[in-house]
């Protein structure tokens, strides 16, 4: 299922980040490394997100009640595909080249 509005507000996402309530998938870390981003660089990209970077929201394949916000920000290396999911007040990040 998809929709055109984000279920998670950017201010909530950024607050979770600032509180250290964030983790990343292994594939996100590998994708970031391929783009020469370390984890701190990924977090900096998230902190710089604006509403205009939003692309879509979709549910996870495993659970259609869990929503993922997809952003496509432009970085120094080009546009990236960034999925953000909040589960139990923890931000989960997926990051790869678009």
Model-assigned labels for residue ranges:
Residues 1-98:
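Ribonuclease/tRNase effector modules and their secretory precursors
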